[in-house]
Amino acid sequence: MSRIEISTESLDLPLVHAFTIARSSETVARTTIVRALWNGLEGLGETAPSARYDESVESARAAIAAHPLGDDPYALENAFDGLPPAARCGLDIAFHDLIGKDCERPLYQLFGLDPGKTPVTSFTIGIAPISEMIAKVREVGTHPIIKIKLGKGAEIETIGAIRDIYTGTIRVDANEGWTPEQSVTLLRELARFDIEFCEQPIPAGTPERLRWIR
C-alpha cells in the first residue's frame, strides 16, 4: 500500500457581488484545494478558512503540510487528530473522495443515503442597499430558500421589500450584529414576514443572553 501524498493549492475567486455581513465585507473568496494521491487515485477536497476563527489559507496549508498521514485513507478516526478545523475539513473531504473512488461508488451510496431526501440549502444574499438586494433576489429566481444577511440597519424595510417579490422561504442571519434587546424587538417585527428562523443574532459566547432572547 503506497503512502498518501498531499498537495494544496490556493485559489482567489472573484465574486460577482461584494459579499457583506454585519462584521465584514469581501470581494474575493479565498479557498484551498487539497489533493490526496494514493494507489493511482486522486481525492479532491476543499476548505475555506475564516479569519473569524483565527484561520487563514496560509495557516491551513501549513498545518496540512506538517501533518503525518500514513498510508491508509480508510483510517479516518485518528487521521486528523490535532489539526485545526479548516485543515481537517480539506483533508477529510479528500480522504472520503479517495475512499469513494477506491470502492468505485459515490459517497451517498457508501453512506446509505437517498439523494431524493437531501435537504435543500439556502442561497445567501449579502448586505447591500435595498435596491441591490432586491436585484440579487431576482437573480436567484425560483430557488425555494434564501438567507438574508442583516445587522447593519434597515432590517424591517429590507425584509419587507424582499417579501413583496419573493414567496419562498426566508431565513435571516444577523452575524452577531444585534444586542439582545434589539433582537427581541426586531424579531417580533420581522415575524409578520413569515421568517423561518434567525441565525446568530448576538455575539457568540453568550449563551445566557441567547437564552434570554428565546
Language-model region placement:
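Metal- or metallocofactor-binding catalytic centers and their adjacent structured scaffolds
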Residues: 2-3, 8-10, 24, 36-103
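Short amphipathic
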Residues: 3-11, 120-127
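Short Pro/Gly-enriched beta-strand edge/turn motifs at strand-loop
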Residues: 13-20
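Conserved, mostly hydrophobic/aromatic
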Residues: 34, 40, 91, 104, ...
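Hydrophobic faces of well-ordered beta-strands that scaffold small-molecule active sites
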Residues: 43-45, 119-125, 144-148, 170-174, ...
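Catalytic pocket of metal/acid-base enzymes, prominently hydrolases
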Residues: 99-123
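Short, acidic/polar
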Residues: 127-140, 153, 181-186
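Catalytic core of soluble alpha/beta enzymes
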Residues: 148, 153-214
